[in-house]
Amino acid sequence: MLRAINQNSAKVVKSLKQQLVVLEATNVVAYTGTKSFTTTKTFNNTQTKPKIFTSSNVLSFSSPSSSNVFSEILNKRSYSSKGKEITMPALSPSMTEGNIVQWKKKEGDQIKAGDVIAEVETDKATMDFQYEDGNGYLAKILIPEGTKGIEINKPIAIIVSKKEDIESAVKNYKPSSQASSTPVQEEAPKPKQEAPKKSTKTYPAHKVVGMPALSPSMETGGIASWTKKEGDQIKAGDAIAEVETDKATMDFQYEDGNGYLAKILVPGGTSGIQINQPVCIIVKNKEDCDKFADYSVEEQSSSSSSSSQESTPSSSSSSSQESTPSQSSSQQTTRKSGERIFATPAARFEASSKGYDLSAINGTGPNNRILKADVLEFVPQKQEVAQQQQQQTTTTTKKPTTPTSSGEFTDIPHSNIRKVTAARLTESKQTIPHYYLTMECRVDKLLKLRSELNAMNTVKISVNDFIVKASAAALRDNPVVNSTWTDQFIRRYHNIDINVAVNTPQGLFTPIVRGVDMKGLNSISTSVKQLAEKAQNGKLHPSEFESGTFTISNLGMLGIKQFAAVINPPQAAILAVGTTETRVVLSNKPDSPYETATILSVTLSCDHRVIDGAVGAEWLKSFKDYVENPIKLIL
């Protein structure tokens, strides 16, 4: 909404969707729309410098008749002119600082959501830093490559939404640590509240160890068992506990030097522990262990909170005044129980550190993905904060969940793996338009070749190994199937990494055989056996089951003739393999009109957004050719 006011009297310009703009001047242009604009209009016959205004930062104009002064009150930061700070991300659970190895983008380059902008060296490895908060341009690199010891959340670059804003963003940039000079209305002094009673007991130097994030999608975990007991010595790399993640039961290795386990804060068998919630205490000297016998997380938290309030009594009030979050409590999202929450790693880390429930935060990223900015702008309701604090303090005393039984039924609590599997499969069926193609393949030649190879090799090759290899060859011939759907583009993968579904007592796992098109049958067979054994024992590492470009599910060994599998998101296809059966078929031999044949039935489930029906049929045609002529797989 854009209007020019040429009268001397005061005017009020009102936008239906934005704030009010109050005018009392001559020849004033006022705007409350959604895009920024530049004005050089005259205010009371005084030429002003060009200035950019947006609906997000213009709250009021006024020109008091007594002083003829144009006053601008800014209450929100405008990224169109100042840019957005990008901070050092936390790319691993124990990371406190990192190094910029190399910048993948240079100043002025365009950046799209998902682009890798830098290589960051963490305390574990060198990893890609993907920018996930929308599109923009890299205005300024604040930390040059090669810099080491950069603390988490320290600004490293400036991003702007428009290329023409780069110059002004660099010129006007001030580090976030420097408070802006925005005038803030003072509040009447509040009556001083009595500080909570502090703990007077002091403890020797110690380290509070929190629940680690052992998989990218992990939000809570469970302590299956402690492999160390109180008083035991711990060396770097020792497994101190078995942790149940949303994917598997994994060893929690302590890697921050040597010490002694002074206190276990969460007993074995406890589930639903938030990431970074304290689980144990480590000390350097064994004689200090006994001093933590009565250590209490709640007592220490109360003491820390009290100390913080005494040192900065006005910080909370000023913070609440300065921030103008876009999400009010009435606008907060309520998600269904079990619904999958999409959030960036930075957002999960920030929410975890603040104790926020991600299900209550509105996501503004692609597909409603929760971004770090959404977490920073989120203001929880008082009731939610109280519930979160109560939940965190009671988790350590929560007893392990056990099945409850009555005369007519038994209630078995959901494991983390079962919850995640349910959410993922529901998401797949609700968001991916499935269709199914079935084809029968004659596998007599394959079975004969398998017998000959197994007679010569120590590695025993299975029919499933041939299917994995044939699938990779068909993906190489039909690369459209080796893709995934996003709202902005279809991503086609150059690598062929195949997930092989494995059923375990803990639930369904899909470990990955990577680079299948480059492996031989012996290598594929060895990899599948090793991964399946790890899955059965709950020892899979996240890198062995996260991602993948195509999935195979084989129920043939259970006598299933044919079935249709659910696509493993974000992949675009999954192959369901049934059992083989012997049939009588027409023969091409002149001496016999009939012969027996071994037939294998397979069904390809496809994402119709990515794979058209004809493309899926071509893939199955290629797959059938490789299965019926397996010599092609070893050439």
From Swiss-Prot:
<feature type="domain" description="Peripheral subunit-binding (PSBD)">
    <location>
        <begin position="342"/>
        <end position="379"/>
    </location>
</feature>
<feature type="region of interest" description="Disordered">
    <location>
        <begin position="171"/>
        <end position="204"/>
    </location>
</feature>
<comment type="subunit">
    <text>20 to 30 alpha(2)-beta(2) tetramers of E1 + 6 homodimers of E3 + 60 copies of E2.</text>
</comment>
<feature type="compositionally biased region" description="Low complexity">
    <location>
        <begin position="387"/>
        <end position="404"/>
    </location>
</feature>
<keyword id="KW-0496">Mitochondrion</keyword>
<keyword id="KW-0677">Repeat</keyword>
<feature type="region of interest" description="Catalytic">
    <location>
        <begin position="403"/>
        <end position="635"/>
    </location>
</feature>
<dbReference type="GO" id="GO:0004742">
    <property type="term" value="F:dihydrolipoyllysine-residue acetyltransferase activity"/>
</dbReference>
<feature type="domain" description="Lipoyl-binding 2">
    <location>
        <begin position="206"/>
        <end position="283"/>
    </location>
</feature>
<keyword id="KW-0809">Transit peptide</keyword>
<feature type="modified residue" description="N6-lipoyllysine">
    <location>
        <position position="124"/>
    </location>
</feature>
<dbReference type="GO" id="GO:0005759">
    <property type="term" value="C:mitochondrial matrix"/>
</dbReference>
<dbReference type="InterPro" id="IPR011053">
    <property type="entry name" value="Single_hybrid_motif"/>
</dbReference>
<feature type="modified residue" description="N6-lipoyllysine">
    <location>
        <position position="247"/>
    </location>
</feature>
<dbReference type="InterPro" id="IPR036625">
    <property type="entry name" value="E3-bd_dom_sf"/>
</dbReference>
<feature type="region of interest" description="Disordered">
    <location>
        <begin position="382"/>
        <end position="413"/>
    </location>
</feature>
<dbReference type="InterPro" id="IPR004167">
    <property type="entry name" value="PSBD"/>
</dbReference>
<protein>
    <recommendedName>
        <fullName>Dihydrolipoyllysine-residue acetyltransferase component of pyruvate dehydrogenase complex, mitochondrial</fullName>
        <ecNumber>2.3.1.12</ecNumber>
    </recommendedName>
</protein>
<feature type="compositionally biased region" description="Low complexity">
    <location>
        <begin position="298"/>
        <end position="334"/>
    </location>
</feature>
<feature type="compositionally biased region" description="Polar residues">
    <location>
        <begin position="174"/>
        <end position="184"/>
    </location>
</feature>
<feature type="region of interest" description="Disordered">
    <location>
        <begin position="295"/>
        <end position="338"/>
    </location>
</feature>
<dbReference type="Pfam" id="PF00364">
    <property type="entry name" value="Biotin_lipoyl"/>
</dbReference>
<dbReference type="GO" id="GO:0006086">
    <property type="term" value="P:pyruvate decarboxylation to acetyl-CoA"/>
</dbReference>
<comment type="similarity">
    <text>Belongs to the 2-oxoacid dehydrogenase family.</text>
</comment>
<dbReference type="InterPro" id="IPR006257">
    <property type="entry name" value="LAT1"/>
</dbReference>
<dbReference type="Pfam" id="PF00198">
    <property type="entry name" value="2-oxoacid_dh"/>
</dbReference>
<dbReference type="InterPro" id="IPR001078">
    <property type="entry name" value="2-oxoacid_DH_actylTfrase"/>
</dbReference>
<dbReference type="InterPro" id="IPR023213">
    <property type="entry name" value="CAT-like_dom_sf"/>
</dbReference>
<dbReference type="InterPro" id="IPR000089">
    <property type="entry name" value="Biotin_lipoyl"/>
</dbReference>
<dbReference type="Pfam" id="PF02817">
    <property type="entry name" value="E3_binding"/>
</dbReference>
<feature type="compositionally biased region" description="Basic and acidic residues">
    <location>
        <begin position="187"/>
        <end position="197"/>
    </location>
</feature>
<comment type="function">
    <text>The pyruvate dehydrogenase complex catalyzes the overall conversion of pyruvate to acetyl-CoA and CO(2). It contains multiple copies of three enzymatic components: pyruvate dehydrogenase (E1), dihydrolipoamide acetyltransferase (E2) and lipoamide dehydrogenase (E3).</text>
</comment>
<keyword id="KW-0450">Lipoyl</keyword>
<dbReference type="InterPro" id="IPR045257">
    <property type="entry name" value="E2/Pdx1"/>
</dbReference>
<dbReference type="GO" id="GO:0045254">
    <property type="term" value="C:pyruvate dehydrogenase complex"/>
</dbReference>
<keyword id="KW-0808">Transferase</keyword>
<feature type="domain" description="Lipoyl-binding 1">
    <location>
        <begin position="83"/>
        <end position="160"/>
    </location>
</feature>
<keyword id="KW-0012">Acyltransferase</keyword>
